[in-house]
Amino acid sequence: MTWPLPDRLSINSLSGTPAVDLSSFTDFLRRQAPELLPASISGGAPLAGGDAQLPHGTTIVALKYPGGVVMAGDRRSTQGNMISGRDVRKVYITDDYTATGIAGTAAVAVEFARLYAVELEHYEKLEGVPLTFAGKINRLAIMVRGNLAAAMQGLLALPLLAGYDIHASDPQSAGRIVSFDAAGGWNIEEEGYQAVGSGSLFAKSSMKKLYSQVTDGDSGLRVAVEALYDAADDDSATGGPDLVRGIFPTAVIIDADGAVDVPESRIAELARAIIESRSGADTFGSDGGEK
């Protein structure tokens, strides 16, 4: 059979190249069709002028519970001091046991999530086995590092990786949360929770206080939704539950059975319960604050 693209190298002609390179979809595409990659990852020059007028997405939270992990994200995107979107999806299932949530420049974040999912699927198709969790971390770190030039010009997108390590010796502690910096450095969270985005400080403070209540997936989901509610209370770029429009955070639960999207009806139920409990609190005491 003749290779149909004379202006590009065939797979078999990549002499001297380790075969493992072919298991990376990003590396393969960079060789065969670099124009199909995002400019930052393909090595092209990022747009001048930074990202002052580009939509941004925040906030993402993740927390572990015995036997799994929960990841949730708000729905708001901002453009400077304006709200550019109210129903943005920021949490994606990337394979059977992994999910990513990415905060930052919306366009870059979405490209990251989609390309990472294809990267994992491509590896499994070629090698016949899925990547180990450590391998998944390294692949995402390489992608983040490839975006460094764009990040230095303001097109920053930071992922949060959550997953279930099927090779863990103890299934009850197999939930994993990994955070990344702009240079591709990564850290496996040992505290049991993490957040990224402009509201991450407030979300982490909320989870720190509530984490002792987490005993299973359902209680973990409630704490994640409540953390986003607290973040939205103090961070204008984070959107809380919108009862009027019927817009609620999105969430993924990952355990030994795999990763599943939490139904919107369940998140709405939890959000309403949280708002009702906060609204019902007697802030000023039994006399309403009057003498």
From Swiss-Prot:
The UniProt Biotechnology section states that this protein is used in the following way, namely: In the course of search for new antibiotics, a class of oxathiazol-2-one compounds has been identified that selectively inhibits the M.tuberculosis proteasome over the human proteasome and that kills non-replicating M.tuberculosis.
EC number per UniProt = 3.4.25.1
Reported regulation of activity? The formation of the proteasomal ATPase ARC-20S proteasome complex, likely via the docking of the C-termini of ARC into the intersubunit pockets in the alpha-rings, may trigger opening of the gate for substrate entry. Interconversion between the open-gate and close-gate conformations leads to a dynamic regulation of the 20S proteasome proteolysis activity. In vitro, chymotryptic and tryptic activities of the proteasome are both completely inhibited by epoxomicin and by the peptidyl boronate inhibitor MLN-273. Also inhibited by Mg(2+), Ca(2+) and SDS.
Its UniProt pathway annotation is:
Protein degradation; proteasomal Pup-dependent pathway
Please, which domain of life does this record's source organism belong to? Bacteria
Site residues by UniProt (Covalent link with the inhibitor MLN-273): T58
Q: Please give the residues making up the propeptide in this record.
A: 1-57
Q: Where in the cell is it found?
A: Cytoplasm
GO MF, any single term: threonine-type endopeptidase activity
Instruction: Note the InterPro entries from the entry.
Output: Ntn_hydrolases_N (IPR029055), Proteasome_sua/b (IPR001353), Proteasome_suB-type (IPR023333), PSB_actinobac (IPR022483)
Gene Ontology CC annotations of this record = cytoplasm; extracellular region; plasma membrane; proteasome core complex, beta-subunit complex
Q: Knockout: what is the outcome?
A: Cells lacking the core proteasome prcBA subunits exhibit reduced growth and persistence in mice. They are also attenuated in interferon-gamma-deficient mice. They also display increased sensitivity to reactive nitrogen intermediates (RNI) and increased resistance to oxidative stress.
**Main localization of the protein?**
cytoplasm
What SUPFAM superfamilies has UniProt attached to this entry?
Answer: N-terminal nucleophile aminohydrolases (Ntn hydrolases)
Q: Which family does it belong to?
A: Belongs to the peptidase T1B family.
Q: Which HAMAP family match?
A: Proteasome_B_B
Q: What does this protein do?
A: Component of the proteasome core, a large protease complex with broad specificity involved in protein degradation. The M.tuberculosis proteasome is able to cleave oligopeptides not only after hydrophobic but also after basic, acidic and small neutral residues. In complex with the ATPase Mpa, degrades protein targets conjugated to a prokaryotic ubiquitin-like protein (Pup). Among the identified substrates of the M.tuberculosis proteasome are the pupylated FabD, PanB and Mpa proteins.
**Domain notes from UniProt:** In contrast to Rhodococus, the M.tuberculosis proteasome does not require the propeptide of PrcB for correct folding and assembly.
Protein name per the record: Proteasome subunit beta
Q: Which organism is it from?
A: Mycobacterium tuberculosis (strain ATCC 25618 / H37Rv)
